[in-house]
Regions:
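Beta-rich catalytic cores
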Residues: 30
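Intrinsic disorder/low-complexity segments
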Residues: 122-124
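Long, intrinsically disordered low-complexity tandem-repeat segments
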Residues: 108-118
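Conserved catalytic cores of phosphodiester-cleaving nucleases, focusing on short active-site segments
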Residues: 34-36, 42-52
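Nucleic-acid nuclease catalytic cores
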Residues: 68-97
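Mg2+/Mn2+-dependent nuclease catalytic core
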Residues: 51-70
Length: 125
């Protein structure tokens, strides 16, 4: 099981009230990993990233997708390793260009898995 699948399982476990659909789409490059639907009736996407450094790698297609879809799109990053201060960080899709350049030095909209989950649950409320 890959690291992003493990991250998905953690996210799903912490958010039983969100309906999750994993998107495995080879015909639309750059499409985020997850489509979520919360109890407020709000759809949103989440790109999952796991990194052992402060850098997050994105394909040009992923960057383009988030630039074209800046609202209700998120990037959830899990930092692995002994120097990881904030293991789980979430960023708005509209910040992807800055996130691609600065990595985890960029200020996240949420820190910690619980806070990230609460943010997604409250969208549209």
């Amino acid at each position: 099981m890959g690291p992003e699948v493990k991250l998905y399982k953690k996210l799903k476990e912490f958010t039983p009230q969100i309906i999750w659909n994993r998107i495995e789409n080879l015909s639309l490059p750059g499409m985020p990993d997850l489509l979520g639907y919360n109890t407020s009736g709000t759809f949103f996407t989440v790109e999952l990233k796991v990194t052992k450094s402060n850098k997050i790698k994105f394909s040009p297609h992923q960057i383009a997708w988030h630039v074209q879809h800046p609202k209700n799109s998120f990037i959830l990053a899990e930092a692995l390793g002994p120097r990881s201060r904030n293991r789980f960080q979430m960023f708005r899709g509209s910040c992807i260009m800055e996130l691609s350049g600065r990595g985890l030095e960029l200020e996240a909209c949420c820190l910690g898995l619980e806070a990230c989950c609460l943010e997604l649950e409250s969208l549209g409320a």
